[in-house]
Structure formats: C-alpha cells, structure tokens
C-alpha cells in the first residue's frame, strides 16, 4: 500500500442536492476519530472544483451544469492518469459521484490498450443520459458516459445542439470514446437506474 496517492475532489455540481462537497473532509475527520493515519500517511492532491457554478443559471434541464462536469472530468482524469503513470495507485475521494466518469477516463488514459472492468457499488446504475434522464442531474450519467451510451431508442428529450455536443465531449474525454464495455461492468446493490 505504499504507492497510494489520494485525489480529493470536493465537488457537488453533479448532484441534485447540496452538501456532497463536505464529504471529503467528513471522511478525514472520521478517520481521526478512529485514530487512523491514512490521510497523513499518503500523498494527496486536491483537485480544484467548479462549485461556484451552483450560483449560475442552469443551461440545460437535461444535463445540469454539464460544462462544469466536463471540466471536472478533465481535471480528475488527468490527475488519475498522471498518478498511474507515476506508479501510484490513485484513490479518488469525491463529493458527488458524477466524477466517477472522470476516474474511469483517467484509468483508461493511463492504460489505453488495457481492458477495463468496473465494479459499480451503488443503489443506482447511473446509466441515464441527457436523452433519458428524469432529473437532469449529471450524477445519474457517469457510467453511461464511460460506456459511451446515448440510449436514444428510449429517449424522452430532444437535446439542443450545445448539450448534445457537450455530451459527446464527455463520452470521448481523453480521445477515447468507450472506456469500458457494458459487458465488463458488474453492479452491486442496484435498485434503480438514477
């Protein structure tokens, strides 16, 4: 475990409710309560977040704060990729889980020829897209972005050109369109799609 690198991402722009950004610090405080030196022992990188856009008008009701999520995917993916190329095992601790797509992208960027598998431990599949989402919250879409799925055959929304373009950018982050194949995803504790 000596090669672990912590990547802290106190972001909450993909969630529908506020407070997820406090999770990283809450985990660190809980570790202190259990007298764990985990957060002191390993090197750490804190990713700059875009939480300020929470105070701006939503541009697309079907992909809320998409530009900020795209920025976060880019930052997280580069941090994960750089960590792996420096022979670290990245442990990403985030607020909302929209950044999971950036984590998966970063692993694929570091190992572009490797086949990835994902164990998705969540109550929700996070396979919605801007075409199918009931909420527009981006935390319901990271796995769909990672497998490059639009699910247009089940669409309930027509996207404007800007939203469709940003969704395509999210899916092809790192110039790799499909980071993981659908058959290489395993779900644990799933009860719903979003």
Model-identified regions with their sequence ranges:
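Conserved alpha-helical scaffold segments that buttress catalytic/binding sites
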Residues: 2-194
């Amino acid at each position: 475990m000596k090669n672990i690198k912590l990547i802290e991402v106190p972001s909450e722009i993909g969630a529908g409710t506020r407070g997820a950004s406090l999770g990283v610090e809450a985990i660190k405080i809980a570790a202190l309560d259990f007298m764990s030196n985990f957060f002191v022992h390993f090197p750490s990188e804190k990713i700059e977040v875009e939480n300020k856009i929470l105070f701006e008008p939503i541009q697309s009701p079907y992909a809320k704060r998409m530009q900020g999520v795209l920025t976060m995917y880019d930052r997280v993916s580069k941090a994960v990729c750089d960590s792996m190329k420096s022979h670290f095992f990245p442990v990403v601790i985030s607020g909302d889980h929209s950044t999971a797509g950036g984590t998966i992208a970063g692993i694929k960027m570091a190992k572009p020829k490797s086949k990835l598998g994902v164990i998705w431990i969540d109550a929700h599949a996070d396979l919605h897209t801007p075409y199918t989402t009931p909420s527009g919250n981006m935390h319901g879409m990271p796995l769909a972005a990672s497998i490059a799925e639009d699910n247009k055959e089940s669409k309930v929304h027509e996207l404007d050109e800007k939203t469709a373009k940003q969704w395509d950018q999210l899916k092809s982050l790192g110039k790799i369109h499909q980071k993981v194949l659908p058959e290489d995803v395993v779900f644990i504790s799933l009860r719903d799609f979003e």
